[in-house]
């Protein structure tokens, strides 16, 4: 299979076309480094203006979705030490958090002196059923599955809507995420949420889950009382989109907070043992790695060399971890 000579995109990925030099259309459309620097500055200043307007208006300035991974840990530190925000950290336990990640989370929130809540949905009656179905069925639109597996899409979808519920109820003006520059473009790094848009997006996610577990899924999504408070809908923000990103420097910085890489996690998810299994099922169903778009964007953006990018896209996974996940899911 041919790969783009500049990034790592394969020729059989949806909507990818190579020119006569073997360069993919995504690389040809990539913004110049200079223009990207301008956009980052623009969105960083936009965030600072919004902070100035929203700071101190509620019990917290921002609800940070904190997975315990390297990127969300670094984002948490940025929000506290650089932007000086009052933070409520929110961790969603999907049943596959490594023991070391629990230790990392405790170390970091204590070191940064941040309030923290952990939410663990029922596993047997909710998460297990959703993950089992997502392993075999597509569930979501093809466009969504180009960027993440159905399992990961389910998980992050629950995180988004639970965090949104908390933010509306507690009148917190921002919800933060640790998305890397490869996961989402800088132009979406600050997004004011509109109820009509959220309701439409909610249906695309909630509908498939409702078919799996029934009315119980309503617990994890918005109610009419939330939609009745449009002025309390927060901004979603992922600061790494407009920040300098250097993985080696990030790892060195968070090490000082008591963070260590857990055993058994792969290169793309330093907080979740389910990820390797999710990747494996996605590759077997669709023929491409679910992290392709993210890693290719990293390479194009200069955050990662092409050879390193290819190492982040392994087809073979840790069999011991994958088998353990299968057993827990009853597959």
Where does each model-flagged region fall?
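Nucleotide-activated chemistry modules centered on ATP-dependent adenylation/adenylyltransferase
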Residues: 1-62, 78, 82-331
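Short, glycine-rich nucleotide/cofactor-binding loops
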Residues: 62-71
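Hydrophobic positions on the alpha1 helix immediately C-terminal to the Walker A/P-loop
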Residues: 74-75
